[in-house]
Amino acid sequence: MIHELHNNPELTGQVRLIENITYAAVAGCPLKMQILAPWTQRYPKQYHTDPRPLIVFVQGSSWRTGRMGEEIPQLVQFVKHGYVVATVQHRSAIDGFTFPAFLKDVKTAIRFLRHKATKYAIDPHRVAIWGTSSGANAAMLVGLTGDDPRYKSHLYAHESDRVDAVVSCFAPMDVPDTFKASAKVPGNKLLQFCLFGMDTSKWPAEMAAMSPLDVAEPGQDYPPFLLMHGDADQVVPYHEMVDMYNKLDKDGYDVEAYRVKGANHERDFWSQQVYDIVLDYLNQKVK
């Protein structure tokens, strides 16, 4: 028997991966991103694609240059639910780029995406950032320092790097505490020198500037935050999320938090339930 199916003239549910887009070149270092977009975006003359809310995803990497493609298979589902997703890389601390290089890069990526919003079918007024581990540290800092001139480069300077929602998965919220907890991990001290420089007298101030728990202040115009963390995390202590939640909540900010029972760092943290919670949250806040 020959079965019959209808075609898909609107390309509904089809996702396009646009690889190795250079969004900036800093100190001779090309910075890349990958974009997941609806297939119709590829054929603007044949198809109209309504602007979609954007998710900027920052992969955890211990503040090195993260692997952009690691979460691509999981992120496809968000495009099928009406988003454009960009996974962005940043300069690596171990290559000599101290804090706040990674933060400046992620903010530059956001401004680039707003600048190219029409090309990639992005609604520049609906932008969320989502990060994991060190990428979640970057995401939190982006949310807490929107358009802060200290972290703004000259690239696409007319665009805003503010975001409309932040999703943080197992982020270092208290950087000194994170490094203390992982003191026995090989390379721990070297990474601190890479992030904060050779003058250790400056480390406390630099660590504070990189710690969302220290950066957050009352009376600011912050976006809503979704915090998620495994209570068996062996890399970033779970209590850091609790402390961050309590601080934001006490100061009257829009914040939700989830404890993932028995979950370590990455790996068994992830489940379809986690992705569904993130999707539902973003649908409420930016869609």
Question: Where are the model-predicted features located?
Answer:
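Alpha/beta-hydrolase superfamily serine-hydrolase fold, recognizing
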Residues: 1-287
